[in-house]
UniProtKB/Swiss-Prot annotation:
Keywords: Amino-acid biosynthesis, Cytoplasm, Glutamine amidotransferase, Histidine biosynthesis, Hydrolase, Lyase
Biological processes, Gene Ontology terms: L-histidine biosynthetic process
HAMAP family: HisH
GO molecular function annotations of the record: glutaminase activity; imidazoleglycerol-phosphate synthase activity; lyase activity
Subunit text: Heterodimer of HisH and HisF.
Pathway in which the depicted protein is active: Amino-acid biosynthesis; L-histidine biosynthesis; L-histidine from 5-phospho-alpha-D-ribose 1-diphosphate: step 5/9
Name of the gene: hisH
Pfam families, sorted: GATase
Catalytic activity entry: 5-[(5-phospho-1-deoxy-D-ribulos-1-ylimino)methylamino]-1-(5-phospho-beta-D-ribosyl)imidazole-4-carboxamide + L-glutamine = D-erythro-1-(imidazol-4-yl)glycerol 3-phosphate + 5-amino-1-(5-phospho-beta-D-ribosyl)imidazole-4-carboxamide + L-glutamate + H(+); L-glutamine + H2O = L-glutamate + NH4(+)
Protein name: Imidazole glycerol phosphate synthase subunit HisH
Domain Glutamine amidotransferase type-1 residues, every copy: 2-212
GO annotation, cellular component aspect: cytoplasm
Catalytic residues in the record: C85 (nucleophile), H194, E196
Function, as annotated: IGPS catalyzes the conversion of PRFAR and glutamine to IGP, AICAR and glutamate. The HisH subunit catalyzes the hydrolysis of glutamine to glutamate and ammonia as part of the synthesis of IGP and AICAR. The resulting ammonia molecule is channeled to the active site of HisF.
């Protein structure tokens, strides 16, 4: 089995690669895990992981420039697919960041957290939302196996998903209001948080993906 981590020059790729390889060992899978910016090699993979880090306009431009946008669209149709952070945001119709169109797999927009956010005690919250936060699983999913409700994951983001269809929301967090942080549809699963930075919980989720 081959799992491709898409390399379009935008993301914490070697950290993702290391985490996915560790997850493969935990899963006991004989799986080849590799970075690739080659659309043909991505198209031959059995599973695809789509990380991303940085500004969405830059990520979308890099993806298109490398000819990987069509490979991603094809993978979304028929392969187990995991989007991470900006890689997840790129799956939506549109982002407020740079007024950027995405790939349109999920209906909805990516919105910026408002300025002057306050926590329940009236203290100012910083944007970007950075650090550990609990995640509520709002639906059952195979990738949640072995992960308790309200497990903490690691976030770094100024923008968040606003899906059109609430049935695609699989998990939520609060900052300070609830926002979608996991979405899924058919063969596609995507998280706003960084699984590769989320220690045991992130490794378990990646292991579940390799077993999916």
């Amino acid at each position: 089995m081959q799992t491709a981590i898409i390399d379009y020059g935008m993301g914490n790729l070697h950290s993702v690669l290391k985490s996915v390889r560790t997850a493969g060992q935990l899963a006991g899978k004989n799986v080849e895990i590799f970075l690739s910016g080659d659309p043909e090699r991505v198209s031959r993979a059995d599973k695809v992981i789509f990380p991303g880090q940085g500004a969405m306009p830059d990520c979308m431009a890099a993806l298109t420039r490398g000819g990987l946008d069509e490979a991603v669209k094809d993978a979304l149709k028929n392969k187990p697919f995991f989007g991470i952070c900006v890689g997840a945001q790129l799956l939506f119709d549109h982002s407020e960041e740079g007024n950027t169109d995405g790939l349109g797999w999920f209906g909805g927009k990516v919105r910026r957290f408002e300025r002057d956010l306050l926590d329940p005690q009236g203290c100012r919250l910083k944007v970007p939302h950075m650090g550990w936060n609990t995640v509520r699983q709002t639906q059952n999913h195979p990738l949640f196996q072995g992960i308790p409700q309200d497990t903490r994951f690691y976030f770094v983001h100024s923008y968040y998903f606003a899906p059109e269809n609430p049935e695609t929301i699989l998990g939520e967090s609060d900052y300070p209001s609830p926002f979608a942080c996991i979405v899924g549809k058919d063969n596609v699963f995507a998280t706003q948080f960084h699984t590769e930075k989320s220690h045991d919980a992130g490794l378990t989720m990646l292991k579940n993906f390799l077993n999916w």
